[in-house]
């Protein structure tokens, strides 16, 4: 019996020692504490940020659903659970859907900030025109995605832009460096938030992005983002200029509404 027990304990010990070495090496992710070293690292970071942006925590559900439930376009019940407080206007800053949107938005913002730093780091190392163009494409998309994320966050967590509300609370601005653990942060003004959004968009324009897919940030839908931002700022001249650039672009096929009726 003693021999059986000793053998059994030996097997358990072997399994435990084996389990200690079962960590799977990352193949598509980069440790956030380490700089990006390859074009693929930068591309993966962009795809990760885009996935988070389109996921249910942010634009894929929560952002759109918040407007639907608060506006009584959709109805919630105790059995569904989600968005019940939104539907009844009994939510506060601790409501789950709002917390998730805030956290997810800043995950995207941090990912874009890291991506910009990584793309510039890798750009200094590569020599081929193809790799440089890929990184240039990524840089415009990171800046554009960061701007869009701040814009949509401001729609949820800030008052509507106006001269009266401009000095009021905006968002925490993460600029060239990510916020360190335990670093004290403050919300900027609404005016500074919108100024930073436009600054990001203008910076994005400085990169000659060759991306044409409508599923990614490209020069045309970046103009559409600018048009929407300026519309919310009540800058109607700027809105018309940006919107006209989209409408008159030959990048996408125009559809006649009469053909769809």
Q: Where are the model-predicted features located?
A:
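Conserved, well-structured interaction surfaces
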Residues: 82-157, 188, 203-210
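Alpha-helical solenoid repeat scaffolds, predominantly canonical TPR units
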Residues: 111, 193, 200, 207, ...
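Hydrophobic-face positions in mid-chain alpha helices that act as interaction patches
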Residues: 39-44, 60, 73, 80-84, ...
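Short coil/linker segments at helix-helix boundaries
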Residues: 125-133, 156-191, 195
């Amino acid at each position: 019996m003693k021999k059986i027990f000793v053998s059994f304990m030996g097997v358990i010990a072997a399994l435990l020692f084996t389990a200690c070495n079962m960590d799977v090496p990352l193949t598509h992710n980069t440790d956030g504490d380490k700089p990006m070293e390859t074009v693929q690292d930068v591309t993966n970071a962009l795809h990760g940020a885009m996935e988070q942006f389109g996921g249910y925590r942010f634009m894929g559900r929560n952002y759109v659903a918040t407007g639907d439930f608060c506006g009584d376009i959709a109805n919630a019940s105790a059995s569904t659970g989600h968005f019940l407080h939104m539907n009844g206007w009994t939510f506060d800053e601790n409501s789950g859907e709002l917390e998730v949107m805030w956290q997810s938005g800043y995950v995207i913002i941090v990912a874009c900030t890291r991506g910009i730093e990584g793309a510039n780091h890798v750009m200094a190392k590569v020599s081929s025109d193809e790799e440089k163009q890929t990184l240039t494409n990524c840089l415009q998309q990171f800046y554009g995605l960061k701007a869009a994320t701040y814009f949509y966050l401001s729609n949820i967590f800030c008052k509507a832009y106006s001269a009266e509300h401009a000095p009021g609370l905006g968002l925490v601005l993460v600029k060239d460096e990510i916020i360190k653990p335990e670093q004290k942060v403050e919300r900027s003004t609404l005016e500074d938030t919108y100024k930073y959004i436009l600054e990001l968009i203008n910076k994005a324009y400085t990169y000659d992005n060759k991306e044409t897919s409508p599923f990614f940030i490209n020069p045309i839908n970046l103009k559409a983002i600018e048009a929407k931002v300026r519309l919310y700022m009540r800058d109607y001249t700027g809105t018309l200029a940006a919107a006209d650039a989209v409408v008159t672009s030959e990048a996408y096929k125009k559809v006649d509404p009469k053909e769809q009726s």
